[in-house]
Amino acid sequence: MRHGKAGRKLNRTASHRKAMFANMAASLITHEQIVTTLPKAKEIRPIVEKLVTLGKRGDLHARRQAISQIRDAAVVSKLFDTIATRYATRNGGYLRIMKAGFRQGDNAAMAVIEFVDRDTYAKGAADKARVAAEEQAVAA
């Protein structure tokens, strides 16, 4: 019996779950919106919310804790520079989960998880180019 056991196994080993959540958190921070299954979205939400809170702390120890979880320095720098400043006045509730129907292949419940007040133009490499262009325009 699994009385009082928190979290979902998602039919994966512990190491696979840990790696999957790290990859999903990095993708969510990079693109600010991802489409996944509803149980995965519900599991990744508290992980990313705690990472945003680490970003809001902003000290070296918090940055190292975030890097140990995400394992991508570029994503952590976006988390600490862009996302943490955006939510500086908000106490929690940085993400929203919206149901997005069912997947055709296996009828799995799908969901969109995204940042509240997200940058609608955040599209990975294109987002970096756009931000760099805006910074050059401000500097000039």
Swiss-Prot record:
Keyword Lipoprotein: no
Record InterPro entries: Ribosomal_bL17 (IPR000456), Ribosomal_bL17_CS (IPR047859), Ribosomal_bL17_sf (IPR036373)
Short name of any one Pfam family annotated for the protein: Ribosomal_L17
Superkingdom of this protein's organism: Bacteria
Biological process (GO), any one: translation
MF GO annotations: structural constituent of ribosome
Entry's Gene Ontology cellular component terms: cytosolic large ribosomal subunit
Keywords: Ribonucleoprotein, Ribosomal protein
Family according to the record: Belongs to the bacterial ribosomal protein bL17 family.
Subunit organization: Part of the 50S ribosomal subunit. Contacts protein L32.
NCBIfam families tied to this protein: L17
Name of the protein this chain belongs to: Large ribosomal subunit protein bL17
